[in-house]
Every structure is written in structure tokens, then in C-alpha cells.
Design a protein with these regions (language model features):
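C-terminal alpha-helical interaction appendages
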Residues: 2-89
Length: 89
């Protein structure tokens, strides 16, 4: 089975596009969108936090780290999107 990052890279190569991919969160990738002609990788926020917990952070610490250092970081037009899946609301 292909990894999520590989699928995103194949899509980008097919259309000669580039974007930013958040390191360490490949298993949380749910898709890619085009916004104002810029591709953006979409992540499941809850899975991202779970990945941080699996790496050894406490739940509250993982959420705080994610909010400040990951979803709160603006990196330009191709900044990834972190969404709340409807099942988690």
C-alpha cells in the first residue's frame, strides 16, 4: 500500500505543482485541495494530535504543541490545512 505522502507527491508531479507537507504527520493526511491555484495538503487534526501522543507527549501537551507549532504556523500560500472531521465534532 502506498503511503499518503507518496500519493500526494504523485498528484503534485502529475500536474507539475509544489506544496508544503508537514513532517511527521503523513498518516493524518486526508487529501489535497486547490485554493487560489495553490495546492494545500489537508490533515485530520485529531490524528495529528494522536501522533504527538504516540511520540510521548501527554494529551494536553500534545494539543498545545499542535495548536501553537503546527496549525498555528503560517508558511505562506501553501500552508497545510488542519480540519476537524465531522465524526469528531
Amino acid at each position: 500500500m502506498e503511503k499518503n505522502r507518496d500519493k500526494i507527491n504523485e498528484f503534485l508531479e502529475q500536474f507539475d505543482l509544489t506544496t508544503l507537507i508537514a513532517d511527521g504527520f503523513d498518516e493524518a493526511i486526508v487529501g489535497i485541495i486547490m485554493q487560489d491555484e495553490h495546492p494545500k495538503v489537508v490533515y485530520d487534526e485529531y490524528k495529528c494530535v494522536d501522533i504527538l501522543i504516540e511520540e510521548g507527549l501527554a494529551e494536553e501537551e500534545a494539543q498545545e504543541y499542535f495548536d501553537y507549532n503546527v496549525s498555528g504556523a503560517y508558511m505562506g500560500e501553501s500552508t497545510p490545512i488542519f480540519m476537524h472531521p465531522i465524526s469528531g465534532i
